[in-house]
Amino acid sequence: MVWPEFTDAAILGEIDARHLFRVVVDDAIVGVFSVAYEDPAIWGPYERGAHLYLHRIARAAQYPGRGLMDAILAWAGHQCTVLGRDGLRVDTWASNTTLIAFYQRRGFRLVGERRLGADPRLPPHYHGNAFALLERSCDA
């Protein structure tokens, strides 16, 4: 999947807040992802408890099938535990059944599905789309 563009301000805001992380292998950035500690814009009525949220996970096209996602999930699970969070959460387009199944094989359960309206906290490409909401324990 190719992500629509995010504004420089949004990306710089995540860097400044220390929420954007990179995965480096042999001095090359092979992946990036962001974390959040709440997500009411996407999770809405499902937003309860203190979870660690993973967002915008992306990997270099030249780096498929090398366990990058598993490494990110392991790191996030450890951070989730260290920070005393209730669990780890991810979301994706509800139509992305391949990624939903991938997460389920890694211990995530489908909590629900939510169609988002126009929300100034979210980029326009989120508006009107349905998202699958998944969570697991920190140490799954």
Predicted regions and their residues:
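Conserved GNAT-fold acetyl-CoA-binding loop/helix
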Residues: 1-13
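Conserved S-adenosyl-L-methionine
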Residues: 112-114
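Conserved beta-hairpin
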Residues: 18-36
